[in-house]
Amino acid sequence: MALDPEIASRLKRNADGLFTAVAQERGTGQVLMVAWMDDIALDRTMRTRNATYWSRSRGEHWVKGETSGHTQHVHSVRLDCDGDTVLLEVEQSGPACHTGTHTCFDADVLLAPEA
């Protein structure tokens, strides 16, 4: 199958045909991770509700949790105002980060909240 042409026409891709995907935890709103998608990954994600991404390093599609069991069930997909980023609202099973942490954004605080 191919991505719905109406959706595809709204996407702005980089030179490699990719766009940013942000995975946000359903319920908490916490950002879990950022990855890349292409049209095929978005189509697969929308058809299966299993988050599918594009690996730039491996040059292939991957389904989150396919090997680790740490899956992302996708509840909704939203396109940002510029058309270059999608927001996936997901139910995360296990850690989202490859380091074993719940989110990829808990390593270094560059600017702490004001007290």
UniProtKB/Swiss-Prot annotation:
It holds the Pfam family PRA-CH. Mg(2+) binds at residues 80, 82, 84. Its cofactor is Mg(2+); Zn(2+). GO terms for molecular function: magnesium ion binding; phosphoribosyl-AMP cyclohydrolase activity; zinc ion binding. The keyword Iron does not apply. It catalyses: 1-(5-phospho-beta-D-ribosyl)-5'-AMP + H2O = 1-(5-phospho-beta-D-ribosyl)-5-[(5-phospho-beta-D-ribosylamino)methylideneamino]imidazole-4-carboxamide. Its EC number is 3.5.4.19. Zn(2+) binds at residues 81, 97, 104. Keywords: Amino-acid biosynthesis, Cytoplasm, Histidine biosynthesis, Hydrolase, Magnesium, Metal-binding, Zinc. Binds 1 Mg(2+) ion per subunit. One of its GO terms (cellular component) is cytoplasm. It is found in: Cytoplasm. Pathway: Amino-acid biosynthesis; L-histidine biosynthesis; L-histidine from 5-phospho-alpha-D-ribose 1-diphosphate: step 3/9. GO terms for biological process: L-histidine biosynthetic process. It comes from the Bacteria. InterPro entries: PRA-CH, PRib_AMP_CycHydrolase_dom, PRib_AMP_CycHydrolase_sf. Its main location: cytoplasm. Belongs to the PRA-CH family. Homodimer. PANTHER family: HISTIDINE BIOSYNTHESIS BIFUNCTIONAL PROTEIN, PHOSPHORIBOSYL-AMP CYCLOHYDROLASE. NCBIfam families: PRK00051.1. Catalyzes the hydrolysis of the adenine ring of phosphoribosyl-AMP. This is Phosphoribosyl-AMP cyclohydrolase. The gene is hisI.
